[in-house]
Amino acid sequence: MSLVLNRTDLLVVAGALFLTFLTTRFIRAAQRYHLPPGPTRIPLLGNLHQVPLHDQQKTFAEWVKKYGDIIYIQLLSKPFVIVSSVRAAQDLMEKRAVKYSDRPYFLLLCEFVMTRPLMIFMQHGDRWRRLRRWYQGSLENKSVLEGYRPVLRREIGRLLSSLAEAPQDFMSHIKRYNGAVMLDIAYGHRVTSAEDEFMVFADKTISTVTSLGSFAATLVDFFPILRYFPAWTPGSGFKKQALMAKEMWDEMEDIPYRKLRHEMGSDAVNRSFTTFMIGEVSHDGKLGADDEIDIKGSATLMYVAGSDTTMTTMTTFVLAMTLYPEVARKAQAEIDHVVGLSRLPGLDDKDSLPYLECIIKELYRWNPPVPLGVPHRLCVDDNYRGYDIPGGSMIVPNVWAMSRDPSLYPDTKTFRPERFEGLDAQAMKFRDPRKYIFGFGRRICPGRYLADSNVWLFLASVLASMDIGRAHDAAGHEIIPTPSFKDGIISHVEPFQCTIRPRSERAAQLIRESTGNTSA
């Protein structure tokens, strides 16, 4: 027996020793904490081999049946806690907000794509608090929100007209509508067509960035050392795509901002979030470089976050009304009784239309726009229900699982607004989907009131003036669409067929009149 090992033997021995070392560390780390339950982990991979590439929220929801609503998993060396009930999410991210308000470090986005991270991706600190105050002043102030009503009403009129003229393109019209609303509010930019230069470019940019991977879960997020490797080395191919994404992202931030700065001081500029912030933070008409970067980023986030998710809820509404026409008829009867046939509903009618409010809640529940939310990060070790949650854990709110909680929502697959009728405030504390689809605690979406008003006005206006029905095939048979949603950060509705037409000649007249009406 030779005492001299060849190179292959040495590699095998070294590998075995390394695996033994990692396994020992893995076992000791697990023993140090009384972790929440979860699927069995293995050294090196953790649970990576058990997490699917697609529809992760559904897999995590299945795990709830076995492990409960707080699940611990480990992806390579990163600890994750999947939170799948409203109660647990509120206990952790709201009642213990001091510990749970941080964000994980989005390495790819923050170091390769964005000059500075947007507020939604920013870690907790003074700069985050400053930008949060900006949004609160523009999106959570009642008088400021009322100032956006003419924009909503003007664009609703254009949307109804487009739906009447070319109903088959309803998804494109809804997309244009939301983009137009947010561009006007963010920059004062008026959109006249779905081919608006900025909207088209922004759509391409967002698609490019989202194709890089999920929040804080790309290869370089797990292996930060890859940031130092040349682009040609294995595992570093993301750099080329990230460079292209950065160029596009910078341009997306610059195009509307440059246009607005050029127009400021002239009659061509419209009041907007950006003009307001420039006036607030400039000194003697001049902006510091840091302030300019923050204003551009904040306006970009307002557009990106406000247009895409709201569009999803609106297209989900069209799908739901196609599948459940009895819901539309019940809502139309309520609107006709309360509002009448001489005008379209306005936001002042909101409290008088309770069934419409139930429909909105059910839309949020039936297809939550961001199924896995945006992850939080636990700053320090914590203990919940007797379980240890290690500091640094990524806290993932499984919003989709919350919306499918059978203890809150019987028959979860069915679109049934009546489930929200007659519930008191205590019941709504956990059942109202607004309690979880907009985020939690200090990280709750500051644009939620604007988004909610936007969705309400869209639903009320379409139901009051339009009939949504099922399309027919060449043989005259009804085409019943399958409720199908794209896998991704945002749960977009898959394309489907339906019919949309004015309810009556009087409704058609109201649609024509609405294009010049800015009273919401």
Curated annotation (Swiss-Prot):
GO terms for molecular function: heme binding; iron ion binding; monooxygenase activity; oxidoreductase activity, acting on paired donors, with incorporation or reduction of molecular oxygen. Heme binds at residue 445. SUPFAM superfamilies: Cytochrome P450. Its cofactor is heme. It is found in: Membrane. It is an enzyme of class 1 (oxidoreductase). It is a single-pass membrane protein. Pathway: Secondary metabolite biosynthesis. Its main location: membrane. The chain crosses the membrane at residues 10-27. Keywords: Glycoprotein, Heme, Iron, Membrane, Metal-binding, Monooxygenase, Oxidoreductase, Transmembrane, Transmembrane helix. Pfam families: p450 (PF00067). Its EC number is 1.-.-.-. Glycans are attached at residues 6, 141, 270, 517. GO terms for cellular component: membrane. PANTHER family: P450, PUTATIVE (EUROFUNG)-RELATED (PTHR46300:SF7), P450, PUTATIVE (EUROFUNG)-RELATED-RELATED (PTHR46300). Cytochrome P450 monooxygenase that is able to use delta(6)-protoilludene as a substrate to produce delta(6)-protoilludene-5-ol and an unidentified hydroxyprotoilludene. Is also able to use phenanthrene as a substrate for oxidation. Belongs to the cytochrome P450 family. This is Cytochrome P450 monooxygenase 176. It comes from Postia placenta (strain ATCC 44394 / Madison 698-R). The gene is CYP176.
